[in-house]
Amino acid sequence: MEESKMKKVLAILFAVSLCISSLYTVAFAEEEMSNEMIPVCVSVPEGWDAPCCWAWADDGTNAFEAWPGEQLEPLDDGWYYTYVPRFVQNIIVNASEASVQTEGIAVEAGKAVWITVADDATASVSYEAQSMAEIPEYVEKFTVHAYVP
């Protein structure tokens, strides 16, 4: 009889540990998904130097620390790109040290987006590739501050 109780206790402990580990896995997967980065590709008019992307969610959460946002990297055929967090729902494209910019552009959260900026700073949005250029894989960027005497 004692052995039977011990088996039940061990079975319950095993079941509880499985439940806890599965909760951890689900939480980790959700966190990883919320940190997923989505490509934003932009075509700007001639004369828009050093274009940048400012991005935020409807709840006011900013994707970047400060204006003018993330500088776009050259792609091909006059296109530029950057990555934004999957929660982004609004984008402003600006350039020439923020002297020119679009209005806020509503985009679908979690979808790669292609934005074409016209000469009058209006923008059109597409969720289908507008260039044959291959977007490089996301690589996290961070600032390193160093003191060198």
Where do the PLM segments sit?
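Aromatic-rich carbohydrate-binding modules that target alpha-glucans
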Residues: 46-85, 97-106, 148-149
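Structured interaction patches on ligand/partner-binding surfaces of diverse proteins
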Residues: 97-129
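Positively charged n-region of N-terminal signal peptides that target proteins for export
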Residues: 1-12
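Exposed beta-strand face motif in extracellular beta-rich ectodomains
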Residues: 87-91
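A short, amphipathic beta-strand motif
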Residues: 36-44, 142-146
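Sec-dependent signal peptide cleavage junction
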Residues: 20-34
